[in-house]
Design a protein with these regions (language model features):
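N-terminal Rossmann-like FAD-binding beta1-loop-alpha1 element of flavoenzymes
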Residues: 6-33
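Short glycine-/acidic-enriched loop or helix-start segments at secondary-structure transitions
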Residues: 20, 43, 116, 161-163
Length: 165
């Protein structure tokens, strides 16, 4: 168990972000999952009708499976090929609801900046010991949260490559 009171921030509540949160829980760390969308897997839902090219057995992280099974979750057929919607409904939503993750999930929290608190690019002495200051935008405005580490699982869905790039 880690005695650091600050959480580890995970940016994004898609498959990778929630798997990271589950792994943090397994290792005794507190996650703080910051999702820009209004639901877990928000980017996945935008292509929810598309069938994923890998079966369920390759899409469920071991630490996530452990948390889910403790809550009574029954895994889908490992050889089946889910759609994006299936992935959200049968895996991400139940994972986000487990008691080890649910209280640490913040929907509608768009991360706009990550820095070391009290430091800029020119100031380096002591930087490694400073917490991360994460600026988030919500419907209520801008705020700052602190974390001891940051995992960026925000994905690339919001950063498309233009034609010809």
């Amino acid at each position: 168990m880690n005695n650091d009171p600050l959480p580890v921030a995970v940016i994004g509540a898609g498959p990778v972000g929630l798997a990271a949160a589950a792994e943090l829980v397994k290792r005794g760390a507190t996650p703080l999952v910051l999702e820009a969308g209004d639901a877990v897997g928000a980017a996945v839902l935008r292509w929810g009708h598309v069938r994923i090219f890998s079966p369920w057995k390759y899409n469920i992280a071991p630490a996530a499976r452990d948390l889910l099974e403790r809550s009574g979750w029954v895994a889908p057929d490992g050889d089946g090929y889910p759609t994006g919607r299936d992935l959200v409904d049968a895996y991400l939503t139940p994972l986000a609801a487990v008691p080890e993750i649910a209280p640490h999930l913040r929907l509608g929290h768009r991360v706009t900046r990550v820095t070391r608190r009290g430091f800029d690019k020119m100031k380096t002495a002591g930087r490694d010991d400073a917490p991360f200051a994460i600026t988030v935008e919500t419907n209520d405005g801008e705020s700052e949260v602190l974390a001891r580490a940051v995992i960026d699982a925000s994905g690339t869905y919001g950063l498309p490559n233009p034609i010809g790039a």
